[in-house]
Design a protein with these regions (language model features):
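Nucleotide/phosphate-binding catalytic cleft detector across ATP-hydrolyzing
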Residues: 1-158, 164-182, 189-190
């Protein structure tokens, strides 16, 4: 039995996986390619993105997250399972003590929060902790989140953008919006 600590930034456009002592070890698109005839996942992440348009019509690309939350529970679970497997370098992780801390947008509903936790557990994590994205971004940026001073963080993601003020170890206020995201910016540039 061994224990692995993994941090996951589950994003609409990309998913990042961090492993304690190694840093960010996976940075891949949040895409799953599914063989609809066989009803099974064929490719995940960069592999799935690379095969878009190069496969028979029976293989369809799916983005399992929309606007920062789970849109397809089963596909999200499959994607997380593959990313955890890659993080552990293919070793079987059944019986291992994989502990995952995973980010969620601020302001998600209790149902959306529970869906993320359950998808992560179904993917093989034995223990799941949830942190709001602005807090994770502030900690990652080295901001003094525990100090009695306000720190503002702006996190522009693929599906949601968030602004938060953090002080004394908590989020004082936050707003999440869908108006300006990297997906929206890419779409505007292509017009």
């Amino acid at each position: 039995m061994f224990s692995k600590d993994i941090g996951i930034d589950l994003g609409t456009a990309n998913t990042l996986v961090y492993m304690r002592g190694k840093g960010i070890i996976i940075r891949e698109p949040s895409v799953v390619a599914v063989d609809v005839k066989m009803d099974r996942v064929r490719y995940v992440g960069q592999e799935a993105k690379d095969v878009i348009g190069r496969t028979p019509g029976s293989i369809v690309a799916v983005r399992p997250l929309k606007d920062g939350v789970i849109a397809d529970f089963d596909m999200t679970t499959s994607m997380l399972q593959e990313f955890i497997r890659k993080a552990l370098k293919g070793r079987a992780f059944a019986g291992s003590r994989v502990r995952v801390i995973i980010c969620i947008p601020s302001g998600v509903t209790a149902v959306e929060r529970r869906a993320v936790k359950e998808a992560t557990q179904n993917a093989g994590a034995k223990r799941v902790s949830i942190i709001e994205e602005p807090m994770a971004a502030a900690i990652g940026a080295g901001l003094p989140v525990a100090d009695p001073t306000g720190s503002m963080i702006v996190d522009i993601g693929g599906g949601t953008s968030e602004v938060a003020v953090i002080s004394l170890g908590g989020i004082v206020t936050s707003r999440s919006c869908l108006l300006y995201t990297s997906d929206a910016a890419d779409e505007a540039r292509s017009v």
